[in-house]
C-alpha cells in the first residue's frame, strides 16, 4: 500500500469509526476493550482516553514505563492540533515533505506524528477528544485502535482494512 492509499484509508477509517454517544462509562468500557485486545496480542500498552481536556481513562499495563506516558501525551497533542489520527498526520507530513516543526511551529518534544492516537468523534457532534496508546511499534498501535474501535461500535469483523507498512 502506497502513501496515497494509506491516507485514503485513514480518511475512510475516521469517517467510519464514529460513535453514537460518549460519556464517562463509555470511556471506561472502551479503555477496558483496548486493554483486553492488547493482552490478546501480547503487548504492554499505556492507554489514555481524554475528552474535552479531561482524562476519563488512563491505564499503564505491566511492562510499560514513563516513556510510554510521554508518547501518549505527544500523540494526543497531534490529534488535538490536527483533528486526525496521529498516524494520518505523519503520512500527511511525509506527503508534503515537511515536519511538525516546519509546518506548525511546534516542538517534537511535545508532538509526535506516529501511530497510536485517534480522534473520538461522535455523530452529529464532531471530535470530542482522543484515544491514545503507546507500547507497540507505532503502526501496530494504530491498527490495534482501529480493531478495537470497529468492534466497539459494532462494525462487522473485517470491515476495517488494517494498514500495512508503506511500499513505494
UniProtKB/Swiss-Prot annotation:
InterPro entries the UniProt entry points to: PduO/GlcC-like, PduO/GlcC-like_sf, YBR137W-like
Pfam families: HbpS-like
Matches recorded under Gene3D superfamilies: Haem-degrading domain
Family affiliation: Belongs to the UPF0303 family.
Name used for this protein in its record: UPF0303 protein YE1367
Amino acid at each position: 500500500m502506497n502513501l496515497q492509499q494509506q491516507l485514503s484509508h485513514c480518511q475512510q477509517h475516521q469517517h467510519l469509526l464514529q460513535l453514537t454517544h460518549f460519556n464517562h462509562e463509555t470511556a471506561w468500557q472502551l479503555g477496558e476493550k483496548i486493554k483486553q485486545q492488547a493482552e490478546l496480542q501480547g503487548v504492554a500498552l499505556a492507554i489514555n482516553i481524554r475528552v474535552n481536556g479531561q482524562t476519563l481513562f488512563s491505564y499503564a499495563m505491566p511492562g510499560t514505563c514513563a516513556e510510554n506516558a510521554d508518547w501518549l501525551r505527544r500523540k494526543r497533542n497531534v490529534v488535538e492540533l490536527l483533528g486526525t489520527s496521529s498516524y494520518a498526520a505523519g503520512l500527511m507530513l511525509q506527503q508534503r515533505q515537511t515536519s511538525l516543526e516546519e509546518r506548525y511551529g511546534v516542538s517534537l518534544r511535545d508532538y509526535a506524528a506516529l501511530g497510536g492516537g485517534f480522534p473520538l468523534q461522535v455523530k452529529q457532534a464532531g471530535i470530542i477528544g482522543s484515544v491514545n496508546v503507546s507500547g507497540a511499534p507505532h503502526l501496530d498501535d494504530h491498527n490495534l485502535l482501529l480493531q478495537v474501535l470497529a468492534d466497539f461500535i459494532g462494525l462487522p469483523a473485517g470491515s476495517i482494512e488494517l494498514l500495512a507498512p508503506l511500499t513505494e
